[in-house]
């Protein structure tokens, strides 16, 4: 994972409200899906210091991004 992206995601997650952590994780996974396409969910969690169970959420959001983009989402605006 790119060091800059890793730090941006860490910052976003650490500044998310306690009840908004999962939503922020989803948002960051979608935002950087293209850049993170070559890493596994396990690697994602390890690099960010997250529990391995969050890898499932990362994978779901990365897979969902293709459909969201087809519907008009511009991830650069997130």
Where are these regions (language model features)?
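Short alpha-helical "recognition helix" segments of helix-turn-helix
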Residues: 42-48
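Short, Lys/Arg-enriched anionic-surface-contact patches
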Residues: 5-31
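Short Lys/Arg-enriched helix C-cap and helix-to-coil transition segments
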Residues: 62-78
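Internal amphipathic alpha-helical segments of the cytochrome P450 catalytic fold
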Residues: 41-42, 55
């Amino acid at each position: 994972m790119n060091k800059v992206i890793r730090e941006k995601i860490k910052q976003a997650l650490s500044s998310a409200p306690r009840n908004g952590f999962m939503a922020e994780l989803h948002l960051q996974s979608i935002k950087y899906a293209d850049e993170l396409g070559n890493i596994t969910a396990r690697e994602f969690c390890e690099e960010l210091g997250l529990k391995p169970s969050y890898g499932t959420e990362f994978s779901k959001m990365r897979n969902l991004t293709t459909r969201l983009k087809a519907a008009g989402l511009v991830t650069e605006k997130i």
